[in-house]
């Protein structure tokens, strides 16, 4: 194809029009929200290095003149563990979770313009704006969830008719078999997504930073490829918690290792997660992992 000047100019105008329309639509929606300031925080048990010290993401939201102002300056300093994230990760996660509150009508049309009314402040050297040499291997999956919880808490306080409860936190990142080598990323012995105003939570989604885009793979396929047997993998009964709309039920997860070596879950302090979300002014989300004795 030959792209002459006229065609390129027309394409540029078209793309700019798409960006401008997205910005205008987002500003129009935000302008219907009440103005004010709200605060929230979410914590992990530790950074995986100092097991006695929790790490916390703290955020403030101000809504004014059809714009959103998120400020994470009060977040804890970056850590020696692998839970740090860089500034661009925080910005991306904040925008993604904000889009959840902007309605289905705009769902397919978000682009650069959608981010223009969203202003994000971070403090260099903190958990959410770490230095270039900080460890970040688990940052997106783990601290990303904390950022998402803070955003959902802030916006749920501001516009309760659009409230979203937290996703469950992941129990295990991966399973390592020693003897017959293998690494298996489970993603989903997690309970699932929290309730949304007007709707029950959705079971068996992965952690919040995936926005539900990752789910459990087929159990039979897993048992063919890896040397362990699923004894139980089913929803837990009566575990959703009180509320007008239920959360996800949680998972009863039990696996038997059939390899010649030992098999271990990398979890607990390694991933730095509490097993339930802990958000100020927000209902907690519960997990169940029977094999690990997690209530």
Feature map (PLM): residue ranges:
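Glycine/proline-enriched, intrinsically flexible loops and inter-domain linkers
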Residues: 1-295
């Amino acid at each position: 194809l030959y792209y002459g000047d006229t065609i390129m100019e027309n394409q540029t105008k078209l793309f700019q029009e798409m960006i401008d329309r997205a910005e205008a639509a987002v500003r129009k929606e935000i302008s219907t929200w009440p103005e004010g300031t709200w605060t929230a925080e979410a914590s992990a048990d530790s950074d995986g290095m100092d097991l006695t010290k929790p790490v916390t993401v703290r955020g403030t939201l101000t809504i004014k003149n059809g714009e959103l102002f998120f400020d994470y300056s009060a977040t804890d300093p970056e850590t020696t563990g692998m839970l740090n994230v860089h500034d661009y990760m925080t910005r991306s996660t904040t925008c993604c979770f904000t889009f959840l509150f902007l309605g289905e009508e705009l769902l397919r049309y978000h682009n650069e313009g959608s981010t223009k009314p969203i202003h994000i402040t971070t403090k260099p050297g903190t958990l959410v704006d770490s230095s270039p040499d900080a460890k970040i291997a688990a940052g997106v999956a783990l601290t990303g969830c904390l950022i998402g919880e803070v955003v959902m808490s802030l916006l749920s306080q501001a516009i309760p008719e659009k409230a979203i409860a937290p996703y469950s936190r992941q129990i295990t990142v991966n399973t390592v078999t020693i003897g017959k080598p293998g690494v298996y990323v489970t993603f989903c012995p997690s309970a699932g997504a929290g309730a949304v105003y007007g709707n029950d939570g959705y079971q068996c989604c992965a952690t919040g930073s995936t926005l539900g885009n990752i789910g459990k793979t087929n159990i039979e396929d897993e048992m063919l490829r890896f040397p362990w047997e699923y004894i139980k993998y089913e929803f837990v009964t009566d575990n959703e918690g009180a509320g007008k709309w239920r959360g996800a039920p949680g998972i009863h997860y039990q696996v038997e290792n059939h390899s010649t070596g030992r098999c271990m879950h990398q979890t607990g302090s390694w991933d730095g997660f509490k097993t339930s979300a802990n958000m100020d002014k927000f209902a907690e989300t519960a997990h169940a992992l029977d094999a690990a004795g997690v209530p």
